[in-house]
Amino acid sequence: MRKGTKALFAVMAVSALVGAAPAVDPPARPGVDAPELARLGAYPVGVADLELVQPDQADPLKGLGAPAMADRHLPLKIWYPAARAGPGTRYRTALSGETGIDVPFAVAGIATPGVAQARGRFPIVILAHGYGNTPELLCWLGENLASKGYVVVAPAFRDPPISDRSAAAFAGPLARRPLDIAFVAAEVQRRARAGQGPFAIADAERTALVGYSMGGYGVLTAAGAPLDPWVGGATRGVLAPYAAGGAKADLLKVANLKAVVAIAPAVRLQDKPIWAGSGVAAITAPTLFIVGSQDHVVGYDPGVRTAFDAEVHAPRYLLTFKEAGHSIALVGAPAEMRRTFWDIDWLEDAVWRKDRLLPLQAHFVTAFLDRYVKGDAGKAGFLDGLVPDSDTGTWPGLPRGRFAGFSPGAPTATVWKGFQPGKATGMMFEHKPAS
């Protein structure tokens, strides 16, 4: 190769490096325009992997005349408060492409694998992902909560490819979500009491459930909403004994439950109600619903708003992102997931930026869990008495210019407490007490 050509390639290589996109910040780390409680807590974050095995479980995806029986393997991603900071990590995961072939990609994380745990006893959060998702897509919330003193346990449910729209494929996630959530919660609590492994610092008496989409269906069911008997038939009989009136119905309910967060939860399937009788009215644990007003996957009204109205025996809250769709809880799309419409539609919203959506949710989830799981009454001002429409808030005496301080909330201002000027916009937040 001639010297001139070599020099040209050298210049091109340097230019490519200089012009390369900067590293993406971990989604758990909020931007400077995030509300007050979105910021990371006092603890560094560690992450561990563990597999739980539940023997002799019915698998509706296998077997001819009846579901096959096999051991159920559940890999867990566990985020926890750490004793010291570390370099962080990169989570490697994948989502099903349009052809059913997985598209691999990586997500930056603030957690460090294997770092020593902090001392203390921390509440348990079971974090349940959506249909076809993975725990890594919710790492922003797992890491953020761990930095604030929670042990977050996220099972990988290993659903069939979402491109398979058959009833047979859907039976698996429909059956296993509530069963897996109940099993994981009970086993984590058992190991916490025994001081075992990564759960030695977990407090078995304080548990919260957080679920997105199909995971939202799972956590609401595990919180006490009784399954309609038709779900038994839709799962090849797997859920029949767990449906309302069934011999095992009580086994789905998680013990020591202090709070539930349901993000864009599936509340109707095949245009039928999932739950029997009073449905979510059977839930008594405080519940935070989060949804986009244009969520055409699970529905808004009828849909998630309907469930919020119906859960009359629990104090509940509804955070609505105006014009947002269904993907509100998932990390933003990396370069690998921006090559086709199918791929980017997994992760990105038509209206909202992800670096806004995720910190906004972290703010409200933090306030909610701190109040109802940790008993921090000081967080009530971030939840109660807010003007329902964020766009109508006022702040008399606000300093002129680009003031970056946080609203003090009522009675000084009706701009939502913890928000910067002009940043509480495009949302609704509603509260209804238990009756």
Describe the predicted segments one by one.
Residues 113-164, 269-270, 296-300:
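Short substrate-entry loop that stabilizes the transition state in hydrolases
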Residues 24-125, 147:
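Domain-level recognition of soluble alpha/beta enzyme cores
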Residues 283, 289-291:
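Short beta-strand/loop motif that positions the catalytic acidic residue
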Residues 79-83, 136-164, 171, 178, ...:
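Active-site machinery of serine-nucleophile hydrolases
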